[in-house]
Amino acid sequence: MRLALFTDTFLPQTNGVSLTLQRLTTHLNRRGIEHLLFSPKSAPEDSYADPIRPITSIPFFLYPECRLALPNMSSIQSELTAFRPDLLHLATPFNIGLCGLRYARKLGLPHVTSYHTHFDRYLEYYRMKKIVPLYWKYMKWFHRSCDATFAPSYETLDSLQAQGFQRLKLWSRGIDCNLYTPKKRSHQVRERYGITAPLLLLYVGRIAPEKDINVLALAMQQLPESIQAQVHWLVVGDGPLLSEMRVQAPQNVTFTGYKHGEELAQLYASADLFVFPSSTETFGNVVLEAMASGLPVLTVNEGGVKDLVTPGRTGMIVAPRSPDAFIREISACIAYPQKLAAMGHEGRQLALGRSWESIFDGLIRDYEEIIENKRFDLIPALLPLV
């Protein structure tokens, strides 16, 4: 089996899509599956090893962290003709994904898509709600011809089904429980950041409107004084609202910037509660990372995160976009530290059952089934030629 993957976001960009695809390519290498990956080139001096095929790109004006690819269709077509893929996976619906779609449709090749981001909800945060109907019209066109559309959670699958999408399949997400583990809890984290408060609250993610970061900021500012003295916040990440949030944050908030690998895993394990207000997630990778690290999770009952957290067992779920709801739960946590530990333990047990290996092997089986079904579909068309 030979696969061609198309994505408009990849490393060194840090987001759920790029990290998932990086893990997928690693798994394909382990399984000996030939593949190419077409992705944006972040800088002219960057070098890329096989199987990555970098495409010239420029910063996206609305979100400079993201890249807008400027693909050469002729060059991509030459690469694909030489490679002869059995299936194309279009991970994003933008310029690079469109190149894959054009090639697949032109040659009648098996192709699948994956839905990673609720862009319709993002548009509302950037005062572009009026174009949501146009967005859905485009998305339905993009996904219409594919042999399967993969969604990362049942919540996302249901929302796509409600929009009329067909041939939907679940492609969930896994977690590296050796990297993210409670064993990495370290007092050095508190020493490094000068933390003396008994309860360490953690947020990991982009500092951006679509993450409902204003809810987090208001909860930080409006916690009662008696509670403020007992908690410290670590905010891990970067984004367009970071400067504004720094100015508004109380003194018990530390901003670390982006963290990766072992350093990030240590931050997770050394916190006491993961606080995540985003209502726009299709899955919520950081929530699963927190659970694997033995952290209880305080999040909202909207988006893919609600499929991960069981209230009272692995964390707490509150109404979205409500700073008061977050404040109430954080205040209650102060009195019941043992309950937090118990929920963190149960979250760890859930995460242990979600290995990337089993999830990617399931995806590969889906690929193989789609390729085989496509071959059978061609038989009736070829019979008159026999």
List where the protein language model places each region.
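Donor nucleotide-sugar binding/catalytic pocket of nucleotide-sugar-dependent glycosyltransferases
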Residues: 39, 53, 136-185, 195-196, ...
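N-terminal subdomain of nucleotide-sugar transferases
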Residues: 1-56, 357, 368, 379, ...
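Short alpha-helical donor nucleotide-sugar binding micro-motif in glycosyltransferases
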Residues: 80, 258-259, 266-271, 363
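Short hydrophobic beta-strand element within catalytic cores of glycosyltransferases
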Residues: 296-299, 309
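Nucleotide-sugar donor phosphate/pyrophosphate-binding loop at the beta->alpha transition
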Residues: 110, 121-141
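Conserved donor-binding/catalytic core segment of Leloir-type glycosyltransferases
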Residues: 195-221
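Aromatic "clamp/platform" in nucleotide-sugar-dependent glycosyltransferases that forms part
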Residues: 260, 279
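Conserved acidic donor-binding segment of nucleotide-sugar-dependent glycosyltransferases
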Residues: 310-312, 316-323, 332-338, 352
